A protein has these predicted regions:
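Interdomain hinge/lid region at the active-site interface
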Residues: 70, 81-145
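Internal alpha-helical scaffold of NAD(P)-dependent oxidoreductase catalytic cores
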Residues: 1-92
Length: 145
């Protein structure tokens, strides 16, 4: 919130019904962004769902991490270098699953059980559910990549 965004770098996805409307919409979009693509409503819907996973959900996980750190007297900023490196690796590849790390991808059940025990002592039972669901998804995905 409150950050300035260089709109030229933001991809815009356009849809139109006539060639004339298409020219108008494309001209306007190209005046705003260097990345303009055509996409119908269904494709934009899938794109939006992907953005929610990549941005909204990851930010929520940052918030959970922040709460866990706060209980130890630490600021979320301590994870900054790790978060930035992880994001940089993910966007530098066409297959973020290929650069996935952590106990789930390694099948390190000892570490995962230890984490689950820690999370079980938290005031929010959803933390363990989220941890288990994501770990299972990471493990299953890692077997396919």
């Amino acid at each position: 919130a409150g950050r300035s965004i260089d709109f030229r770098t933001v991809p815009l996805f356009i849809e139109y019904t006539t060639d004339r409307a298409g020219r108008t919409v494309r001209d306007f979009a190209e005046a705003l962004s260097d990345c303009v693509r055509e996409a119908d409503s269904a494709r934009r819907g899938r794109l939006h769902a992907a953005a929610v996973f990549a941005c909204n959900f990851s930010n929520h996980l940052y918030a959970i991490a922040g709460k866990l750190l706060e209980k130890e007297g630490l600021d979320f900023g301590i994870l900054g270098p790790l978060v930035l490196e992880t994001a940089a690796k993910a966007v530098a590849t066409d297959n973020p699953a290929a650069v996935q790390t952590g106990p789930a991808v390694r099948g390190d059940t000892v570490t995962m059980r230890r984490h689950e025990a820690i999370l079980a002592r938290e005031n929010d039972e959803r933390y363990n559910k989220i941890y288990k669901l994501l770990s299972e998804s990471i493990w299953e995905t890692s077997k396919r990549t």
